[in-house]
Amino acid sequence: MALSSPSRILCFALALSAASLSLSFASSHDYSIVGYSPEDLESHDKLIELFENWISNFEKAYETVEEKFLRFEVFKDNLKHIDETNKKGKSYWLGLNEFADLSHEEFKKMYLGLKTDIVRRDEERSYAEFAYRDVEAVPKSVDWRKKGAVAEVKNQGSCGSCWAFSTVAAVEGINKIVTGNLTTLSEQELIDCDTTYNNGCNGGLMDYAFEYIVKNGGLRKEEDYPYSMEEGTCEMQKDESETVTINGHQDVPTNDEKSLLKALAHQPLSVAIDASGREFQFYSGGVFDGRCGVDLDHGVAAVGYGSSKGSDYIIVKNSWGPKWGEKGYIRLKRNTGKPEGLCGINKMASFPTKTK
């Protein structure tokens, strides 16, 4: 399936099937945040115009008219789901983002990449060594973005490298906290070089990436080893290359939200979630409490927590670019009463350690 190409189709020549979509967005008057308005959905021609505007906004291109027709049909189906969800007036809303021309199965195959089948966690040892075990009180809210410990949102693209982005975000955070320097680091080095247990664009695990950084003597800066959205040959480190080091890593006790907040109050964390839900694909804003399982398939970073209108949440940094969610972030509801947390966020959190 070709989702982009250098050539652009100049005209939408097929006689597209007119579909009657009775759509409205009842829960918000600011339609700009979801990417469509009722006027866009009043006629077949306006629906096509909406699709063309979306193509331009996200710089999409299709190799054939047939492919464009197929993507339009998927787009309409996704739009129907988005609008039906928004009409329910939930605490979050969905929008027409970069993934609006992908079926849900295509999306999961292309953008999720955590490999939990290679997990090795010693739960008793994890709790015994947990650095923040004896912390008694934490602030009501923490946002590491405001403390300058979170780099700009990045985009993994269609490479299943979420594990590398999750790892890097946590290392960038602790490095800023300890040294005062926010240094943007290389996910590509992990993809190309951390191959003992991790599998590049075919998934991996954050704990193994932390181990690689320790054994390798650090991780290079992004500018010295830029992201290419594909697996490459590991580039040997040059003597003049600057690296950021860590001393080790620790796991947060499993299914323990209090412990997760204790750690998160002190530094950004690598966390794993179940991001396979269709509502997660199109999340655009608000405190998310939608349907999702606990089968971990996506690595992200927890960078804070807080409350809004009585809803407690965890601030999660994703790696799907700044046009997804709230400028690349999602607020996941916490205090759900389930030990594993919403989308399994309490199941497998970890963090790097650094003393100097």
Swiss-Prot record:
Which CDD domains does the record associate with it?
A: Peptidase_C1A
Instruction: Please classify the protein's predominant subcellular localization into one broad category.
Output: other
- Please provide, in alphabetical order, the Gene Ontology terms of the cellular component aspect for this entry: plasma membrane; vacuole
Instruction: Indicate which residues are glycosylated according to the record.
Output: 181
Q: Which EC numbers characterise this protein's activity in its record? A: 3.4.22.-
Q: How does it assemble?
A: Interacts with PRN2.
Role, per record: Cysteine protease involved in xylem tracheary element (TE) autolysis during xylogenesis in roots. Participates in micro autolysis within the intact central vacuole before mega autolysis is initiated by tonoplast implosion. Involved in susceptibility to the bacterial plant pathogen Ralstonia solanacearum.
Protein name according to UniProt: Cysteine protease XCP2
Naturally occurring in which organism (per UniProt)? Arabidopsis thaliana
This chain is encoded by the gene named XCP2
